[in-house]
Amino acid sequence: MTDLSRSADTLTPARVTTAFDLPGHTTVRSLGVAQGIIVRSRSIVGSFGAALQTIFGGNITLYTSLCEKAREQAFEKMLADARKLGANAIVAMRYDSTEIGSGVTEVICYGTAVCVTPDA
């Protein structure tokens, strides 16, 4: 017997998928959209360092690091939002980003918060 109200504690990154269902599980309840939003800006030092990296071409590691951190933070906020809803899984997870202003970017991570039970 599974207590769905207590199973929200089992929401881990392994129970987040971009698919519309979680393999090996049955969705028993949809709880709505879970989301995490983070707005990041580049520092003057970071912008200068990245500008220097563009001269040589290739991966701009300063921006890559900033983007990775923003995505991680948005993901963690989405998990926290899903836990508040009582979810133990998230399906149809997506990322999106928008430049709000010069050097200011919004990153959103969202998906459908659900309660699942393992298939028999």
UniProtKB/Swiss-Prot annotation:
<dbReference type="Pfam" id="PF01906">
    <property type="entry name" value="YbjQ_1"/>
</dbReference>
<dbReference type="InterPro" id="IPR002765">
    <property type="entry name" value="UPF0145_YbjQ-like"/>
</dbReference>
<comment type="similarity">
    <text>Belongs to the UPF0145 family.</text>
</comment>
<protein>
    <recommendedName>
        <fullName>UPF0145 protein Bcep1808_3406</fullName>
    </recommendedName>
</protein>
<dbReference type="InterPro" id="IPR035439">
    <property type="entry name" value="UPF0145_dom_sf"/>
</dbReference>
